[in-house]
């Protein structure tokens, strides 16, 4: 129980919850634990998100399509992440990415009904979830498209913040054929050069950008 407790305290939805509450949750809630071997698919883009699915161990690789298929964003997700947390409810409740185990990976999941009860019973859980939704809603959906009034740095940071999980690394942004400098604007070539010199990102080819860590890029001030 102690190991499960420690893992649960690191999951975003339980941040700040008391030991007693988490122990009670772990003991009384029907939880499903699964293991996936390297290369196994955990969830597919387009699948209905029916449960709260948490990564407890191992690394997960996610790949999603954005900008109407003109770009693909991939990332490596560490343990304690919740997959598709923003897709549990609403008009679009399908996974927005393919999730594949990079190595042996353990997950825990529980039903939406249980999660709704958690929101009603525990204010900390409710605030954690509301904060996550608020952060996402405050980022304009327009930032996910091409906008002449945004700099290349603003577009790139908005894209990574909205299309990846917190704490992820090894991010790749690939176009379906167009040069990234054309997609991100005339000032992007200079931006990519500065990011390369800083060790934050590297332009692998005209159509692929590698980013070391999400936090490193979001903290970069151009």
Language-model segments: which ranges?
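Cyclic nucleotide-binding regulatory domains
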Residues: 40-102
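Cyclic nucleotide-binding regulatory module and flanking cytosolic helices
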Residues: 1-38, 82-83, 87-90
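Amphipathic, well-packed alpha-helical segments that form the structural scaffold of globular domains
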Residues: 26, 134, 138, 157-161
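Residues that scaffold the ATP/ADP-binding catalytic core of kinase and kinase-like folds
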Residues: 63, 85-86, 117-118, 219-220
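A short hydrophobic beta-strand segment most commonly corresponding to one strand
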Residues: 105-110
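A small-molecule sensor/coupling module
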Residues: 94-98, 113-151
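Alpha-helix/helix-capping structural signal
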Residues: 57, 113-114, 215
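Phosphate-/nucleic-acid-contacting segments
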Residues: 150-152, 159-222
